[in-house]
Amino acid sequence: MASSSTSISLLLFVSFILLLVNSRAENASSGSDLDEELAFLAAEESKEQSHGGGSYHEEEHDHQHRDFENYDDLEQGGGEFHHGDHGYEEEPLPPVDEKDVAVLTKDNFTEFVGNNSFAMVEFYAPWCGACQALTPEYAAAATELKGLAALAKIDATEEGDLAQKYEIQGFPTVFLFVDGEMRKTYEGERTKDGIVTWLKKKASPSIHNITTKEEAERVLSAEPKLVFGFLNSLVGSESEELAAASRLEDDLSFYQTASPDIAKLFEIETQVKRPALVLLKKEEEKLARFDGNFTKTAIAEFVSANKVPLVINFTREGASLIFESSVKNQLILFAKANESEKHLPTLREVAKSFKGKFVFVYVQMDNEDYGEAVSGFFGVTGAAPKVLVYTGNEDMRKFILDGELTVNNIKTLAEDFLADKLKPFYKSDPLPENNDGDVKVIVGNNFDEIVLDESKDVLLEIYAPWCGHCQSFEPIYNKLGKYLKGIDSLVVAKMDGTSNEHPRAKADGFPTILFFPGGNKSFDPIAVDVDRTVVELYKFLKKHASIPFKLEKPATPEPVISTMKSDEKIEGDSSKDEL
């Protein structure tokens, strides 16, 4: 029995040794194959360069492209102070007494902004010269504003999650929080007096009493839009809720009265139940009546939904109304100037049914300042008017109306969008007639079919035709495609990121190279961050490919060895013909 047990143990031991040896042999073979493949590619590259092929030197991604997220790049501009403004040295600044400036982290941020009715918060970076210059002014303002508003600062380099949440793009960025909600970016003077004046105005009583007809007539004449409350009393809970809602709005005034005669001047009937509230505008839609619970939140939502025009013309002034709105979904009409009178009344009629759910926008397609650029961003081409829904948030999805521009059709589009029944529209070049080249051409309409094919590993370059870095990289990428064309499991592809789009293909600059592993397409692609050479890209693919592959090198021609005798005649050789 012992002998049998010993034999089994010995057999298992021998089997383990054999497996280990085989595994090492396979690994050695695999490593040897990779070394051989890399040596081949390096030799090919060397040959190219020795014949005047030139080389490509890694540079920063080209950021001249415009992604138009929230149409941000319709105008080139932006803040003065951005990441990287620290390529200089300055004299050390004297110490500043910041005793009244709170230091926030993710652990105390929510409590701080929630406990202070008015909280100003600066996101800064220690290396930022503009932040350092602001420090003494900010500290002095904090001391003067004690009891009225609280000031704080956050090191964005340490609190990355908060910086990402509030989409910090440059330093310093200063926000005003009202009752725990971020309401406004401070863009005033970076001085103590500038900060104090601005904050005092924001924190001052923002609701005004009207007790005489003369006051009412003056307000109605002067104000382009206003909110008016008819209350049981000018003090107490109703007035407090209205005042709290008023602090959330910067661009219109709030008024209140307890007089039925004055209320009537503001389109409120004397017999109506109090509290009553209206929003008056000197626009096509002149009046909106509030019919919700008389609370700060409900009033603020009503005002936000009704303060904008039914349809906003996309202009410099209109853009701020669109992007500062708390409503992110946009329903957009694209039409030329000579067709706007026909279609705008239709859009306004639809807008009445979807307040608070969409911002309705009109883009004049033939307007040189904005219309042409916005139409191009959305991929709206041709002369015919079009309507589409745009999500306006990070995913930036678009849904186009396929049908006549009628009230019913546009309402159905809006309702189907809200019910998540629509298929997104992607900007796309026409499908390529022939797509059998070494590098596959991807457009918006074949992205799913090729890039998201689970049976393939796909390397995708997103480029721009005008991008110099892309032009320099093109011959290298084409060579990689040529070397790998015979590998069925691997696709080397490219997409023009200026005329095609897909939510899975996000580019922060050009060129952007993404890798989509086979069998794993539900996850985000891998950003390829290696030197842009054939060898380094090949090494990346060997490491990350879900489906193992081996480079198919061109066969080396065998040397021809002659075995003919000296007196044999070559068939068909006319030089041996008789005289």
UniProtKB/Swiss-Prot annotation:
GO terms for biological process: response to endoplasmic reticulum stress. It comes from Arabidopsis thaliana. The record marks 532 as: Lowers pKa of C-terminal Cys of second active site. The keyword Ribonucleoprotein does not apply. This is Protein disulfide isomerase-like 1-3. Glycans are attached at residues 27, 108, 115, 209, 293, 313, 338, 520. The record marks 468-469 as: Contributes to redox potential value. InterPro entries: Prot_disulphide_isomerase, Thioredoxin-like_sf, Thioredoxin_CS, Thioredoxin_domain. The lineage of its organism: Eukaryota, Viridiplantae, Streptophyta, Embryophyta, Tracheophyta. Residues 1-25 form the signal peptide. SUPFAM superfamilies: Thioredoxin-like (SSF52833). Induction: By chemically-induced ER stress response. Residues 44-91, 558-579 are annotated as: Disordered. It catalyses: Catalyzes the rearrangement of -S-S- bonds in proteins.
